[in-house]
Amino acid sequence: MEHKINRREKEKDYEGKHNSLEDADQGKNCKSTLMTLNVGGYLYITQKQTLTKYPDTFLEGIVNGKILCPFDADGHYFIDRDGLLFRHVLNFLRNGELLLPEGFRENQLLAQEAEFFQLKGLAEEVKSRWEKEQLTPRETTFLEITDNHDRSQGLRIFCNAPDFISKIKSRIVLVSKSRLDGFPEEFSISSNTIQFKYFIKSENGTRLVLKEDNTFVCTLETLKFEAIMMALKCGFRLLTSLDCSKGSIVHSDALHFIK
């Protein structure tokens, strides 16, 4: 009886060790198929087969030792590229197609990433997407900065990109907030209008006033230059033929931007 029990215990012990070895081997195999990449400070963990999906590309070259790549302090491959945009590069490798969130506006930057990683398919899809966007007519939107008591005082900004109008509106609010301790009720915002309680005229031009004690926020000229600089940085063109009727953009009551 004891002999049979001991034999069973030995068999169970052997099976347990065998299973442990199998689990350990599976764990090693799993780890060996994974890679951690540090792209511009962002860590991505993916399978090697994902990175080698397309031959003769930058990532395939790293995995197969064709391309030498530096390591970060933790021993991960370091690639000095845009860490946020790499998410879309990796999703392209996983899905075999370009899937971008609604409102994505960084086509040119993503095209540069595709070129760096030598992904011709991704580059072609980005180019195709950008060309379709250029052909799609955009509805002109506007932002009005106005005096509550005198609608003739103020500035209108017209643009064919609604998201850019939102950027300008946020920037104007930020500029105004930075010059005030609080955010007064006299400053009201709607979908397309920023309305101040009073404007005043001074030797230096029209100023935006939010309080009865004439708290200075900024001049309309300052806001015009803010809008123009933002537009140029975002790749818009200023339609000067529309805006220079008064001799100078600074004296114009409307700015028109187009892409």
From Swiss-Prot:
GO biological process terms held by the UniProt record: protein homooligomerization
Family annotation (SUPFAM superfamilies): POZ domain (SSF54695)
Region Disordered, residue ranges: 1-22
Chain segments annotated as coiled-coil in the UniProt record: none
Covalent S-S links between cysteines: none
Pfam families: BTB_2, KCTD4_C
Residues annotated as domain BTB: 33-134
InterPro entries assigned: BTB/POZ_dom, KCTD4_C, SKP1/BTB/POZ_sf, T1-type_BTB
Classification via PANTHER family: BTB_POZ DOMAIN-CONTAINING PROTEIN KCTD4, POTASSIUM CHANNEL TETRAMERIZATION DOMAIN-CONTAINING
Annotated protein name in UniProt: BTB/POZ domain-containing protein KCTD4
Organism: Bos taurus (Bovine)
